[in-house]
From Swiss-Prot:
NCBIfam families: argH. One of its GO terms (molecular function) is argininosuccinate lyase activity. It catalyses: 2-(N(omega)-L-arginino)succinate = fumarate + L-arginine. It comes from Streptococcus thermophilus (strain ATCC BAA-250 / LMG 18311). This is Argininosuccinate lyase.
Amino acid sequence: MAENHKLWGGRFEASLEKWVEEFGASISFDQKMAEFDLKGSIAHVTMLGETGIIAQEEALQIKQGLEELLEEYKAGKLEFDVSNEDIHMNIESLLTAKIGPVAGKLHTARSRNDQVATDMHLYLKAKLVEVIEKIDNLRNTLVSLADKHTYTIMPGYTHLQHAQPISFGHHLMAYYNMFTRDSERFEFNIKHTDISPLGAAALAGTTFPIDRNMTSDLMGFAKPYSNSLDAVSDRDFILEFLSNSSILMMHMTRICEEIINWCSNEFKFVTLSDTFSTGSSIMPQKKNPDMAELIRGKSGRVYGNLIGLLTVMKSLPLAYNKDLQEDKEGMFDTVETITVAIDILAGMLNTMTVNDKHMAESTEKDFSNATELADYLATKGLPFREAHEIVGKLVLECTKAGYYLQDVPLERYQEVSDLIEEDIYETLKSHTAVERRHSLGGTGFDQVKWQIKEAQQSLNK
């Protein structure tokens, strides 16, 4: 009978079949947490020495070995073995090879259950800071572009139909606000991630006189978990990250969809930089917005990662279960997906050319000024519903005749209502329509300038 050399092998008389071992191994992906596993172990062994649970000289020897492994990892020199299952056992094996049997004391008062939870908290906390920095760069890009295009007029849409003329800067600031809320959600996510599970052990804590506050402080956490079962068994901080990432991706797909439309021949509102476009293998003229399409497409994998972990966690009894091995790949994949996608979107926006003249002209070949005429009549005392009816009939008349509201003769306007005077033509201009919308948060130029100023002050804090 084959001898079992696993670190947990004392209980077993036979070894795992190789193909079964490969099925249960996680080192192929959880090695991404190697740096954080080493840092957590350094904090743990420091505490073991300080509290006298192990001798100080042993703690220092183990700590030095871990620090050497950390340097080797950063230099790309560590090699991991699938037979050691996961990152924790790989590092313990490497440490044993480096400093000998004393390495076995590292795991005193610790379980892989609190160890892996600690690794994930450390990993995600670091990545959340990175994600927020990238979102803030995207927000800066949007504010700069909005400031440049405060006075650029474009059609505002509902149902993808021309609705009312708006400032392009106003349109961009809408996305700025969405991404600001995304950033705030990730900030709040840090609060729920900035908690140390270390010391919870397998599920019930430990009989050793550990100092959880010390390890929490050494790792830079705000505090330790107050319940050991909760510490090792829940992954809501990851679910929160995946949920926040899904909302972020949804927002990015919306602006990407608009960019895809805007650079088409049907719109011609923007031209993407060659550095963010691709061509066709058969059609020489093509310049495709592939990066925007990829961001739109990659939303599916991020949504899938959220649903995947929700399904893993559904009905899972306390405390640790092997199901929780499935909590990592979706998290890693989402981190990698959104960090690149944010940078790609910011780069596209920063380098695209805006055809502001064509944007403005497109508002002159539609009926997006119809609300201006209805409001004009309402300000002169006509009930808005009557004004709406009158303007609707005029639009129908113009549509049949092949011209627009600004082309209607004054005589015809005055046949419709004696409230209409010559100033109607100034009112119907797109620039006037935008400029007059002074209500708080509206598209009026003064309001857009105010939004931009508020955003700049927020970003500079």
